[in-house]
């Protein structure tokens, strides 16, 4: 169960598409630049 908790802590973030800042999962807009286009953090590594 601890592994699932770690996964949740690491990946339950939103990334700003403008400045790449990490934001909380509940965020509506970026904490650094105020941009509202946030994506979920990628769970799979890109090739």
Curated annotation (Swiss-Prot):
- UniProt-listed InterPro entries: Ribosomal_eL40_arc, Ribosomal_eL40_dom, Ribosomal_eL40_sf, Ribosomal_zn-bd
Q: Does the keyword Ribonucleoprotein apply?
A: yes
Top-rank lineage group of the source organism: Archaea
UniProt keyword annotation of Ribonucleoprotein present: yes
**Which BP terms in the Gene Ontology apply to this protein?**
translation
Molecular function in Gene Ontology: structural constituent of ribosome
What keywords tag this UniProt record? Ribonucleoprotein, Ribosomal protein
Q: Which GO terms describe its cellular component?
A: ribonucleoprotein complex; ribosome
NCBIfam families in alphabetical order: PRK04136.1
HAMAP family per record: Ribosomal_eL40
State the family named in the UniProt similarity comment for this chain: Belongs to the eukaryotic ribosomal protein eL40 family.
Q: What is this protein called?
A: Large ribosomal subunit protein eL40
Record organism: Methanococcus vannielii (strain ATCC 35089 / DSM 1224 / JCM 13029 / OCM 148 / SB)
